[in-house]
């Protein structure tokens, strides 16, 4: 009986304490408001899926002449061919419409169809993509002085190395009405694609109308074309932004808060594009900020332009040691026979691989300064129509299988 009484007293005490607790939770009210419903917590957002890794290998050390995945790799110290193009023409009917820009576009551009044919041809002829930064590297000589050296590449047996570079991948304003893509975006699968408008004004997202996503797609279909994960080096200016995004400032007009807000929004929009390009084997080089002439412009203007490239472009794409001469114009008139003040300045700013344009894939390691100079070949309208095309480009393709004479204006050809 005493045990039962004690148990009842304990239960009464528990209920009493519970009532006190409830009263404290309701700011002194002794009765609970049972009509109020508790709001459930917001569900945690699902994390963004991490992009799958993209394997990028160093051809100078992997696999050092051994085998990987059943493929034998052998040392290669021969010529490394280098081709460059400008943005490709997606809609020839807009480019070749008889206006004042038609001849220039025919001279210096290729169509998306021609570009696809070139990729197929160099692939069939045994070329594989390599990163320009893997071909030459900086080291020190026996005296401790910095020097550039040509690296031995280890390639799949029977293959030949090919560097690709794409100039002016900025998608300038004039291009938007002349049949080019407008900009790069990430498509619904997170892959690099182009965005633009067709001749009827319809918005088009595609991986078949611009050189960059087209190469991505080609490598997906032919992974042995890029055994080390390399794609191409994008040679960018900055005076009309980069990759189709207007990230530039403009000192020639009064810069307003609205302009700066738009610029900042473009900067934020292009960052994931840059990140995905770099993740998937693309690299960046300078084409100067204003596409300037390095052979004739004053040192003061060259210095100002270079700093602006670092501030507005390099700050987004990251550091680079590659410079592509606009117009192919060499600093100080001749960067091979002389090492003049402009070349010395550019080298002092970190550029070690400096590329012009020529009739062969020429390269020369400078003896008096830590730098290498290169010439690149240029598939475009001038060379596709040239009488020298077989002599200079025959190792890459048969021009008769490349040029799209049905799409181009009738300017004739100089080969049989």
Labelled PLM ranges:
Residues 83-95, 144, 148, 155-162, ...:
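Metal-dependent polysaccharide deacetylase catalytic core of the NodB/CE4 family, i.e.
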Residues 16-19:
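C-terminal motif of bacterial Sec signal peptides marking the signal peptidase cleavage site
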Residues 51-132, 148-164, 173-176, 283, ...:
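C-terminal active-site subregion of NodB/CE4 polysaccharide deacetylases
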Residues 2-10:
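Sec-dependent signal peptide recognition
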Residues 129, 135-146:
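Membrane/wall-proximal cationic-aromatic binding patches
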Residues 24-70:
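N-terminal, intrinsically disordered, polar/charged segments of Gram-positive cell-envelope systems
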């Amino acid at each position: 009986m005493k045990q039962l009484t004690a148990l009842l007293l304990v239960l009464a005490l528990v209920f009493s304490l519970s009532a006190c607790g409830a009263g404290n939770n309701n700011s002194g009210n002794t009765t609970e408001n049972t009509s109020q419903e508790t709001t459930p917590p917001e569900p945690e957002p699902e994390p963004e899926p991490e992009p799958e890794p993209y394997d990028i290998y160093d051809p100078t050390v992997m696999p050092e002449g051994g085998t990987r995945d059943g493929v034998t790799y052998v040392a290669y110290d021969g010529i490394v061919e280098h081709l460059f193009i400008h943005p490709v023409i997606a809609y020839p009917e807009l480019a070749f419409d008889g206006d004042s820009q038609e001849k220039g576009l025919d001279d210096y551009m290729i169509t998306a169809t021609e570009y696809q044919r070139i990729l197929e041809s160099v692939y069939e002829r045994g070329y594989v993509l390599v990163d320009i930064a893997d071909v030459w590297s900086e080291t020190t000589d026996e005296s401790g002085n910095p020097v550039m050296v040509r690296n031995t590449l280890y390639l799949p047996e029977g293959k030949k190395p090919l560097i690709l570079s794409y100039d002016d991948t900025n998608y300038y304003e004039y291009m938007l009405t002349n049949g080019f893509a407008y900009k790069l975006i990430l498509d619904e699968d997170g892959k690099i694609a182009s965005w633009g408008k067709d001749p009827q004004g319809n918005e088009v997202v595609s991986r078949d109308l611009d050189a960059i996503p087209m190469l991505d797609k080609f490598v997906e279909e032919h992974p042995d074309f890029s055994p080390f994960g390399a794609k191409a080096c994008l040679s960018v200016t900055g005076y009309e932004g980069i990759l189709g995004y207007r990230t530039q400032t403009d000192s020639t007009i009064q810069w307003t808060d609205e302009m700066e807000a738009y610029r900042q929004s473009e900067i934020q929009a292009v960052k994931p594009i840059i990140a995905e390009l770099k993740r998937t084997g693309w690299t960046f080089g300078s084409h100067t900020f204003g596409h300037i002439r390095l052979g004739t412009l004053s040192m003061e203007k060259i210095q100002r332009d270079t700093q602006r490239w670092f501030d507005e472009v390099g700050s987004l794409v990251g550091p680079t040691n590659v410079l592509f001469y606009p117009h192919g114009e060499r600093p100080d008139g001749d960067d091979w026979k002389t090492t003049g003040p402009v070349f010395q300045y550019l080298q002092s700013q970190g550029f070690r691989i400096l590329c012009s344009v020529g009739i062969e894939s020429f390269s020369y390691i400078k003896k008096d300064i830590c730098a290498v100079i290169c010439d690149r070949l240029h598939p475009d309208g001038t060379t596709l129509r040239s009488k020298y095309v077989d002599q200079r480009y025959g190792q890459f393709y048969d021009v008769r299988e490349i040029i799209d004479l049905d799409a181009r204006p009738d300017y004739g050809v100089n080969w049989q």
